[in-house]
């Protein structure tokens, strides 16, 4: 079953290899290219606000580890996925499920190479083993889970894939860290009381707040996070946010002033053209009325 997944994504891995080899060096900052094009006259003038925004992006990129850009992060993610796919082909997922999750063979099934379709994980082992996984092991499971498509028949999905996906969605993992998974009702179960049975024709009303569970404060860790959210941002984040708002306001005011000055210049030039055209029109109107003076010997003709 695993070999079928890998065969379907063979073309995708080739495209990832092409993307990785397409660019090995980071391109110059966009703001520098825009200034260079403007100086050479190869492009139109860029608005000051756009230059400020791109400059801020270049400044923030210098504080990232090793100066990585978004393109570098995408290439790194592609490389990690390719490594995980290679590990899946080598059978590391089956070894992980057998040794760390305590997976067992399903009766009346046959083992087919590195496939995991003949395995089943005991429910209690999932909760214990998932918290002891390393980063590489979690990446391996995430890549394996992403190989399935929504159009796939539910019967063709391996049982271990169903178990892992159920735990990732509803187990004590990620946002549900600290929620009870086995043995009792989870703490974030919305309805705290059992609804009564209604007769035909009776009206169904909305439950009051005391009959539902507040999922924001159902466990101590969530309650602490909720109280921290209500207090607001920390001073450092607040300063950065206000600084960004101030820069945006300054850039907007500069653009508005520049646009208003250009409009005023156009109006003044139009007014000047109108003033210069009016005397010329007056001279053209009065020119046919005035007569040229005659010489003394031409008076006898009149």
From Swiss-Prot:
UniProtKB keywords: Membrane, Mitochondrion, Transit peptide, Transmembrane, Transmembrane helix
Main location: mitochondrion
Regions crossing the membrane: 236-253
Intracellular or extracellular location(s): Mitochondrion membrane
Membrane topology: Single-pass membrane protein
GO cellular component: mitochondrial membrane
Bias-annotated ranges (Polar residues): 277-290
Disordered, as annotated region: 20-44, 264-290
Range annotated as the organelle transit peptide: 1-21
Recorded family membership: Belongs to the GEP7 family.
Protein name: Genetic interactor of prohibitin 7, mitochondrial
Organism this protein belongs to: Lachancea thermotolerans (strain ATCC 56472 / CBS 6340 / NRRL Y-8284)
Classification lineage: Eukaryota, Fungi, Dikarya, Ascomycota, Saccharomycotina
Gene: GEP7
């Amino acid at each position: 079953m695993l070999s079928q997944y890998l065969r379907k994504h063979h073309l995708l891995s080739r495209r990832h290899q092409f993307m990785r080899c397409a660019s090995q060096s980071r391109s110059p900052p966009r703001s520098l290219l825009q200034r260079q094009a403007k100086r050479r006259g190869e492009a139109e003038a860029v608005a000051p606000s756009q230059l400020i925004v791109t400059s801020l992006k270049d400044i923030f990129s210098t504080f990232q580890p090793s100066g990585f850009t978004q393109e570098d992060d995408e290439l790194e993610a592609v490389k990690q996925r390719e490594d995980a796919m290679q590990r899946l082909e080598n059978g590391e997922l089956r070894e992980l499920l057998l040794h760390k999750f305590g997976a067992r063979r399903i009766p009346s099934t046959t083992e087919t190479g590195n496939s995991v379709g003949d395995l089943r994980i005991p429910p209690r082992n999932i909760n214990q083993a998932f918290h002891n996984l390393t980063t590489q092991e979690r990446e391996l499971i995430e890549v394996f889970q992403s190989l399935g498509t929504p159009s796939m028949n539910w019967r063709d999905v391996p049982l271990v894939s169903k178990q892992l996906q159920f735990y990732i969605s509803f187990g004590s993992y990620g946002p549900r860290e600290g929620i009870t998974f086995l043995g009792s009702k989870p703490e974030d179960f919305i309805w705290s009381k059992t609804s009564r049975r209604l007769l035909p024709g009776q009206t169904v009303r909305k439950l009051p707040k005391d009959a539902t569970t507040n999922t924001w404060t159902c466990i101590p860790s969530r309650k602490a996070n909720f109280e921290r959210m209500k207090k607001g941002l920390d001073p450092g984040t607040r300063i950065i946010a206000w600084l960004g708002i101030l820069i945006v306001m300054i850039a907007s005011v500069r653009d508005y002033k520049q646009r208003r000055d250009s409009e005023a210049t156009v109006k003044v030039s139009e007014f000047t053209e109108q003033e210069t055209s009016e005397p010329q029109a007056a001279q053209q109107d009065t020119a046919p009325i005035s007569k040229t003076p005659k010489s003394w010997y031409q008076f006898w003709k009149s």
